[in-house]
């Protein structure tokens, strides 16, 4: 498996492009860089059966968001308010920031 430079980060707002949750928008909770996947809030939710423990004596069925491949996600631009491709630009002080390819606005806060 190749290591890709992921442009998706935690707390980003993304839109799902394919699959059962196509068109939904959610916030990235966790990025799994080695597997090229991301866990997105309320996307690809699975029902997990938890056995009773001391912390949770009743156990039961819990909804848990599962990882989605990053190729199926697109970052939402705050100024365009649509899913966009992302580029990287280096500022004069040497800092690298993510920019929107359609409006050239900075995505990083």
Curated annotation (Swiss-Prot):
Q: Which InterPro entries match?
A: KOW (IPR005824), Rib_uL2_dom2 (IPR014722), Ribosomal_uL24 (IPR003256), Ribosomal_uL24_CS (IPR005825), Ribosomal_uL24_KOW (IPR041988), Translation_prot_SH3-like_sf (IPR008991)
Q: Which CDD domains match?
A: KOW_RPL26
What is a single molecular function from GO for this protein?
rRNA binding
Gene Ontology biological-process entries = translation
Which Gene3D superfamilies does its entry note? Answer: 2.30.30.30
PROSITE patterns linked: RIBOSOMAL_L24 (PS01108)
Q: What this chain does, per the record?
A: One of two assembly initiator proteins, it binds directly to the 5'-end of the 23S rRNA, where it nucleates assembly of the 50S subunit. One of the proteins that surrounds the polypeptide exit tunnel on the outside of the subunit.
Protein name as annotated: Large ribosomal subunit protein uL24
Q: What is the lineage of its organism?
A: Bacteria, Pseudomonadati, Thermodesulfobacteriota, Desulfobacteria, Desulfobacterales
């Amino acid at each position: 498996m190749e290591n890709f430079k992921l442009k998706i980060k935690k707390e980003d707002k993304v839109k799902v492009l394919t699959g059962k949750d196509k068109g939904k928008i959610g916030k990235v909770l966790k990025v799994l860089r080695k597997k090229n996947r991301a866990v997105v809030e309320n996307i690809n939710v699975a029902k997990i059966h938890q056995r009773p423990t001391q912390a949770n004596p009743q156990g039961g069925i819990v909804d848990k968001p599962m990882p989605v491949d990053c190729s199926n996600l697109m970052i939402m631009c705050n100024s365009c308010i649509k899913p966009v491709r992302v580029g990287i630009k280096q500022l004069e002080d040497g800092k690298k920031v993510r920019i929107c390819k359609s409006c050239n606005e900075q995505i990083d806060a």
